[in-house]
Design a protein with these regions (language model features):
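Short, charged beta-turn/beta-strand-edge "cap" motif at the junction between a beta-strand
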Residues: 15-18
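Ferredoxin-like alpha/beta domains used as RNA- or RNAP-binding modules
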Residues: 1-6, 13, 23-93
């Protein structure tokens, strides 16, 4: 759980948004976090996600807890990861 902090870029591993990248916006409790794509960027809507269904990456952006989608897009532009977020990750197996 400690790897999933606000601003961490993750990959969804289950559900209809499987293999899409998302960003942790808020920590709800020990089992759930609030994530967003943003939707217009990766297709991931702002929603609650189980931490067991996320794979944390080494990348993170500097955002405040509960940041808006516009703030997140701005932070991604600043570090040059905007285009990288659009690409889905293929399963390694």
């Amino acid at each position: 759980m400690s790897a999933l902090n606000v601003g961490r870029i993750c990959i969804k591993t289950f559900g209809r948004e499987k293999e899409a990248k998302c960003i942790v916006v808020d920590i709800i409790d020990k089992s759930f976090v609030l994530v967003t794509g943003p939707k217009e960027l990766t297709g991931v809507k702002r929603r609650r996600a189980n931490v067991k269904h996320l794979e944390a990456t080494d990348d993170a952006i500097n955002i405040k807890r509960g940041a808006s989608d516009e703030d997140i897009i701005g932070a991604l532009k600043k570090i040059g990861k905007l285009d990288e977020m659009r690409v889905k990750v293929k399963n390694k197996a």
